[in-house]
C-alpha cells in the first residue's frame, strides 16, 4: 500500500511542476515585456490566485460530482495552473521587469531585435531559475494539499498516503488505539517527499543567488 500510494504523488508532482513552470515562464516573460497593459490585468489576477487555498479548492470540487475525476493527474493540472498563474507568475514578472532595463536588452533593441525574440531568447533563459525554484516550492504545497484532501476522501479512491493515514486512525480505534505501524510510513513518506522538493528549491536559489 505504501509503494502503491507513492505513484499518485509522483504523477501529481510531475504534472504540477511542468504545467506550472510552462505557464509561468511563457506568460511571465512575454506579457510583462510585450503586452504591458495586459500585464496590469494579469497582475491583479495573480494576486487574487495567491489568496486561493488549494486544499479548499480540492475540498469544494470533491463535494460535488467531481470526486471520481479528481485523479492525481487532474489535481496536478489544477495545482499547476493555480501556481503558474499565481505566485510563480509574479516572481518571474518582477525578474523580467528588472532584467528588461539592463544594457544587453537595450543593445538588442538597437540592433533591431523583435520583442518576442528578445523575450524568448534573451530574457527567458535568465528567469528560468526563478520559475524552477518557486515551482519546486509550490509542488511541496501541492503534495501536502493532496494529502489533506485525500484524508477526507475528496479526491477519489486512488490508493494514496492520505487514505492510509485515515485508515490508521479510523480503523485503529476499533482495536483500542491508533495503528502506528500504518500511520508512521505514510507520514514519513509525505515528510520526505515534500522535503525533497523544498530542499531542491533552496539549492536552486542558493546556486543562482535568487533572493526574491
List where the protein language model places each region:
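Transmembrane alpha-helix signature in integral membrane proteins
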Residues: 1-33, 193
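Transmembrane alpha-helices
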Residues: 10-11, 15-19, 23, 116-149
